[in-house]
């Protein structure tokens, strides 16, 4: 038997204070994505805190308690790779331009939206998120390697004798790879 491991569905978060729109967004995306729902910015922040990073956030702009751009702005530092899409039935030009220019919003879509266009936009957002995550991980690994090389070089230069140099190198490598014990033994 050939069992293929299924790739987990990308997570998206939809935020709208109108139950009909929230349900419509859920039904549009649930087959292809794991869809999380919130009816306000504060609730969406709680959901993100519980479930972690999502690939795409689709948020209504005009909501009580917190606007869409305010909510999305609060997610930027903690979830920098998340793609943010704003829905609006109104033209809050100043807010939208500021949000887009500051990098908080990937695209904005006017209500009523075209399902096919929104699906294509979310797919593009998920793909972009995956590329960003991959590049971020590559950069993290490269930085870790450079840091290790720097640490080993400094250890070699500062160690008073060969045995201490080897022990410090092993300890440095152990710290870098987050192991609980690193031992240097002669063979």
Task: Indicate residue ranges for each PLM-predicted region.
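Helix N-cap/capping motif at the beta->alpha junctions
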Residues: 37-47, 68
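C-terminal output helix
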Residues: 94, 113-122, 126
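Non-catalytic signal-transmission and effector/linker regions of two-component phosphorelay proteins
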Residues: 1-13
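Receiver (REC) domain active-site loop signature in two-component systems and cognate sites
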Residues: 63
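Active-site residues of response regulator receiver
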Residues: 16, 60, 88
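Helix-loop-beta substructure at the N-terminus of cytosolic sensory domains
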Residues: 159-187
